[in-house]
Amino acid sequence: FAIVISGFYKVFQLFSLDVFGIEATSFAIIDINQWPMWSQLLVFFVLSDFVQWFTHVLLHRFDVLWRFHKVHHSVKEMGFAAHLRYHWMENVLYKPLKLLAVMLLGGFEPEQAFIVHFAAISIGHLNHANIKLSYGPLKYVFNNPVMHLYHHAYSLPKEKSYGVNFGIS
């Protein structure tokens, strides 16, 4: 993901600056580059999670998109590798939305993208690991392996959650 962001910005800078005289940073609604690094990473993580949640809702709600996402839900037994089982078209949906969100917040450095991506992948593996681990009272706030088992159940409750890292979503 870090390479994608870095490459996207370079191509965008070359194209937009040469053709239109526009810099990538001019799309930013706010510029968080001057914020402390920990707060930039936190914003990036929450923003990425929101984009994934939004895309995940679309994948479940629309039949044409569900046809792609059902590959992920077709796993017979949960395990950490289930996190990486998905149709390639899901990336086509996720990545542009995530890149747009990053541009609107003034962009992030590739190193930050790597840190957030690594954290998200680690959490995703944990949530798909088929272990009985909840976070006590925080289980109502953060997605966890037990909650995610319900999400992958064959018969879902009416009020199913689409959350990726946060249970409240």
Label every model-predicted segment:
Residues 2-169:
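Membrane-embedded catalytic scaffold of the fatty acid hydroxylase/desaturase
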